[in-house]
Every structure is written in C-alpha cells, then in structure tokens.
Amino acid sequence: KVIITKKRKTVLVVGSGPAGLEASRVLGKMGHKVALAEKSRELGGRIVTEAKLPGLSEWIRVRDWRITQINKCQNIEVFPESFMTADSVLELGYEDVVIATGARWAKDSIGRHSDCDFKKADMKMIISGDEILESPIKSKSKFLIYDDDHYYFGSVLALELRKQGHEVTLVSPAGRVCSWGEFTDEQTRSNTEVMKAGIQVINNYKIEVVMNGSAELYCIFSGEPKKVSCDFVVPITRKIPVTDLYDDLCSRVEYWGSNGVQKVIKIGDAEAPSIIAAAVHSGYRSAIEIDNPFSEALNFSRREHPLIK
C-alpha cells in the first residue's frame, strides 16, 4: 500500500527501465515531486528490446502500465533524450537522486561454471547480447552462444538469431538448455522451441579459446575437446551494473550539500542485476524507503519478547 508522504521531497530518477519507472510511479503517488530522466527517446530500458524477442511480446506491458500511471500524476515530469552527468545532476539540485541505469551483458566467459576468462580470445569475434539487440548483424553468419546464465535469455536470443537467418550453436555447461527454467516450468518449452528451430545444442561443455574463426570447447566431465566453426561468439554469462554516474556522484560527495543533494542511491540492475520482476521490486522498495529505511528484522522477525522502546 502506498501511503501519502508527510514530507514532500524533490527526487530525480535517472533511467526509465523497470526499476526507474516503478520508483517514479510510487514516488509520484506518494506525493513527491519527481523528475524522470532517460537518455534515449523511448522509455522502458531493457523491456523495450527484450519484448521484441520470440515469445516475450507481453513483457512490454510492464512498461506500458507504468507509463500510463505516471502520465496521470501531475507531479511527475518525464525528460526523454536527457543524458545525465554528475555535473548536470548536481546543477539540478534535487534532494534525492535515484540511479537506475541498468546493467550490460559482459563480454567474457566468467559465469556460474567459470571464475576465469577465455584463455585466448579474438575480441573481434566476441559480441554481447546487448549489441546484437541494438545493432543486428544483417549478413548471414555463424553464431555460437555460450550460455552460462541458464535462464531464458540464451534460448530466446538463439531463436531470434535463427529467425534472422543465421546459423546458431547454443553451448551450455549445464546438462540442458535453460536449466533454471526447471523451477519456473519454462525448461521444456524452451528446449522444444530451440530444437524445432534447428539450433545445434551442445551441453556439458565449457568454452576456452575463441580464435581464427572457431571456438574451442571441452567437456566438463571427461575433458574431451571439441572445435566449433563460428563467426561470432556471444557470451551470456553475467551482467555488469552500469554505475558510472553513481560512482562519479559518490566521488563528489563534498559538493552535494552546496547543491541541495541529500542522498544518492542506486536501484534495480544498477545495484544487483537480476530478472525484470526483481528490478520492479527494487524500484518499489526504494520509493517507500525514501524517508525511512526499511528493516526486515525489525518488522518481520519473530521475537520471544517485545522490543524495548
């Protein structure tokens, strides 16, 4: 339940992904004066690109509903195509600053099954999942997706590349594609669609070398080597938070007071990369805690004796 605040504040939210939109919506409903700044023309962040992938079109509702609610609040201003720097944030002088700048897929092999990078890699062959969605490669190519994330993204990205006419090989250290989907009832559907699309699947293999138009793999159990011909390798291993603005602001903390800034926080994928639902929760929680930080221990822990006040 959103409770109207007794002390209205000015809040700047940077980034309009699921976390930024939810934080803006709740802050506005609480009665705070909110400015939402987005560097691109279209609001939505990762939702915009992921909703275009096979089977994920309904995800755009996460954005659409929140934009509808934001448009109903006269105390929320939205500024698209507004790239923010530490100087511009300080110049605006909002009391609280919420950084929701998201995260980007890494271009290395560090993931759940590996704590080290490729032994050798031609970085011209390495392309991130974000780069594929933002700038699709038009010429027909051979893609190898290395999925050490084990959820939906590796599978749907493989389907998207196959739909574009590319030859796709999906490699995973796990025993099945989308292994985490076993807990969300998505694994069977994911594997079925991948196989129907004609995508070559190689399970129980890790990637070691990316050079000279091929990727060198080895079995995680037997150590048996395997070489796969490819033009590009797409590591789906982990996301790295985009915290440049947050870090820059924190390095200038001595200038906050003179510019009216009281607090700077990061939320959503910028704080801890996860699924869209987690980003929405992070945005909601940051908004309701804007005045009073929430303590799960204080509010929900069962105690033998009442707290002494």
Predicted regions and their residues:
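Generic beta-strand structural signal
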Residues: V209-V210, K266
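Rossmann-like dinucleotide/flavin-binding elements
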Residues: I3-K39, L43, V78-G93, T101-E182, ...
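Short polybasic amphipathic segments
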Residues: G213-Y218
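N-terminal Rossmann-like dinucleotide/flavin-binding domain of flavoprotein oxidoreductases
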Residues: G45-E95, G181-E208
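Short polar/acidic secondary-structure junctions
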Residues: I207-E208, I220-S222
